[in-house]
Curated annotation (Swiss-Prot):
HAMAP family: Ribosomal_uS13 (MF_01315). Part of the 30S ribosomal subunit. Forms a loose heterodimer with protein S19. Forms two bridges to the 50S subunit in the 70S ribosome. The keyword Ribosomal protein applies. Residues 101-132 are annotated as: Disordered. Keywords: Ribonucleoprotein, Ribosomal protein, RNA-binding, rRNA-binding, tRNA-binding. This is Small ribosomal subunit protein uS13. Transmembrane segments: none annotated. It comes from Ureaplasma parvum serovar 3 (strain ATCC 700970). InterPro entries: Rbsml_uS13_C, Ribosomal_uS13, Ribosomal_uS13-like_H2TH, Ribosomal_uS13_bac-type, Ribosomal_uS13_CS. PANTHER family: 30S RIBOSOMAL PROTEIN S13/40S RIBOSOMAL PROTEIN S18, SMALL RIBOSOMAL SUBUNIT PROTEIN US13M. Located at the top of the head of the 30S subunit, it contacts several helices of the 16S rRNA. In the 70S ribosome it contacts the 23S rRNA (bridge B1a) and protein L5 of the 50S subunit (bridge B1b), connecting the 2 subunits; these bridges are implicated in subunit movement. Contacts the tRNAs in the A and P-sites. Residues 101-125 have a biased composition (Basic residues). One of its GO terms (molecular function) is structural constituent of ribosome. GO terms for biological process: translation.
Length: 132
């Protein structure tokens, strides 16, 4: 596995997809990095030469430095997202309340579905109806 920006990227995937394993880098950013490095995005990581991997590292680092004020990666981005959610909960906004209650935030229905957010069903035991 190649290590770029402190993250091990998978060998068996195409380079453009492997770079998206870095939290904060999506497909378009990955394509921009590879274009600057003059590397075909369809090559698999395992087929890259050491010089090409070094070039990707260098270009990615320069790309992050050049866009530092608006591009956050890995730990910084995770921390920012967590702080944003915490701030929403503290100010008591609708979105913050939904986060606090563990319900869907973006307006999805909750009468049915929403199981991912709400967790497994909590069944209510119903009383047996006595027959006379």
């Amino acid at each position: 596995m190649a290590r770029i920006l402190g993250v091990d990227i998978p060998n068996d995937k195409r380079v453009v997809i492997s770079l998206t394993y870095i939290f904060g880098i999506g497909k378009s950013t990955s394509q921009q990095i590879l274009k600057l490095a003059n590397i075909d995005e369809n090559i698999r990581v395992k087929d890259l030469a050491d010089e090409q991997i070094a070039e990707i590292r260098r270009v990615a680092l320069n790309f992050v430095k050049a866009n530092g004020e608006k591009l956050q990666l890995e730990g910084d981005l995770r921390r920012t997202v967590a702080m944003d959610i915490k701030r929403l909960m503290e100010i008591g906004s609708y979105r913050g309340i939904r986060h606090r209650r563990g319900l869907p935030v973006r307006g999805q229905r909750t009468k049915t579905n929403a199981r991912t957010r709400k967790g497994p069903r909590k069944t209510v035991a119903n009383k047996k109806i006595e027959t006379r």
